[in-house]
Amino acid sequence: LEGMFSYNRIFGKVHDVNAMFLYNQKEYDNGDALPYRTQGIAGRFSYTYDSRYVAELNFGYNGSENFAKGKRFGFFPAVALGWIVSSEKFMEPVSDVISNLKLRATWGKAGNSNIGGNRRFAYISTIVNTGSYRWGTDAEIYRLGRSEGEIGVNNLTWETVTKMNAGIDLGLWNGSVNLVVDVFKEKRDDIFMQRKNVPGSAGFNRPVWANYGKVENQGFDVSLNVNHKFNSDWAISAMANYTYAHNKVVEIDEPAAILGTYRSQTGKPIGQLFGLIAERLFTEDDFDENGMLKEGIPAQKFSDMSNLRPGDIKYKDLNGDGEVTAVDKTAIGGTRIPEIVYGFGATVSYKSFDLGVFFQGTGKTYQLLGGETWLPGSSLGAGNIYSNIDDRWTPENPRQDVFWPRMGDKAVANNEQASTWWLRDMSFLRLKNLELGYTLPQRWTTKIGIRGCRLFARGTNLLTFSNFK
């Protein structure tokens, strides 16, 4: 069910007023016992003065069945302001150069009621199957048990995000050059997550849902387009874009063992990589005549100390307690999600020929190679080996800059730990597309009833420039 009222009118030739009010009620049946239901109202009011000053107000008041009474509806307002500077009289002397200049800013809130994990009606506790029971002398009578699953939460409500944006649109020489710049900031509050710090003595079989997490995200976007025709034969079209976005976890319900340690996610980006800091490879000088680490060198507790050998990775004792354990893991590198994404390209035309090229790249993105038992020779059986297998530490090749540390005929647990030794910068610049085309003259194609025909050859992912190996 949906109903809408709209109003549009211009007063005195310079006052442009628009208004809209919407009611929406939806029921969606996907085959479950109960259909999904939503309800809400929305409104918009916009005012433009003399095609120069623009203001717009929006709101949404939405309800969700997932929450208890008193928590089901959320109010989400938004406001946008714009100033078309190029329409001002004082811009007329430079109108041949600056054909469009607009300043704009927005602020708004949005909501999310999708809890996740296929969870509906968060205020109702669930009942799940549990262990079975058998009776009788031969245990022939068999029945499944039932127990409480996720406990209902009455104070769960909408997850919200507050978005702020400021931007500028600039057009030069009647649109031959167009530049768009946006700066943005987002703050997400009351994120749905299952609590990890509830003690087992509370009696919950499964973690309890709560509005707990907070995340901030900020960055900027830049895009540039250039179109120019030099003469009847030559023309060029070029574009470039650049996006930078950085997020930070402000609040998260971390396990008690993580709080206050180097492994805490608070204050770090979402998906932050964690690992040990690799200082170097052990050398013969680090061991005594019995093959044990010399006094003063922190013990590494990832395998039997007697298994440590020259060529194994030496890690930093971050907390200075005299031994290296998982507690010494810390934030390393960044995240697998790139913070920088960019691209640029151009198409040059000469008469009926055109040549186009497009590059794509990312920056500030990292990856930890491998994982447990991935080192060659770690009792993995028959299979392919890496082409750089010779770039490894051996007594005859005791270099510190080898790719592989010491290998053995069995797994070397010490060297398989997530650490900066395996951290790689995954930034790259790629020649994404290269295309050469030729448009057949219309005097040829019209003779066979074809309005236009273009022949082209295209290559994709032809070159990649990266420090990764």
Segments (PLM) and residue ranges:
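Outer-membrane beta-barrel signature, preferentially recognizing the C-terminal barrel domain
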Residues: 32-34, 109, 132-178, 208-231, ...
